[in-house]
Amino acid sequence: MRLMNRRGHAEELVQQVKTRKLYLDPELTLSTLSKAIGISEREITFILNRELHQNFYYFINSFRIEEVKAKLADPGNKHLKIISLAYESGFNSKATFNRLFKSHVGMSPSAYIKTSEYQRLVMSETFI
């Protein structure tokens, strides 16, 4: 993939990372992302800084946090530990995951689960 112009480039970058789930690789770096999608590191950095107002790690970890949230919402994952879901989502450190989750979501993963479970219960009781 090559970005021909600057218009729409942020959306294209987001789409590539999202659809290919490149963020699941805990070893993902700017260099490996660049090689995977065929855009120079310099151009990716420009897009992230100027268009999305994020640095590389914030950008990638945002996808990882959303992945964890989706996994937490899946009843089929209820038996799994939160940290297992975090590792499956590309995190490689419990401390980093907890810090970033709280920073992005505004509460700890455990508090989020309680809130999510409560919302699910309220919704299911509404439809009974």
Predicted region positions:
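A secondary-structure capping/hinge motif
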Residues: 51-54, 100-112
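Central "turn" residue of the DNA-binding helix-turn-helix
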Residues: 38, 90-91
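Terminal helix-turn-helix DNA-binding modules in bacterial transcription factors
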Residues: 51-88, 115-128
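Alpha-helical residues within the helix-turn-helix
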Residues: 35, 46, 50, 87-88, ...
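Basic, amphipathic alpha-helical hairpins
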Residues: 14-28, 48, 52, 69-80, ...
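Short, Lys/Arg-enriched, Trp-marked, Pro/Gly-tolerant hinge/linker segments that flank
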Residues: 1-11, 50, 54-58
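Key DNA-contact positions within bacterial/archaeal DNA-binding proteins
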Residues: 42, 94-95, 110
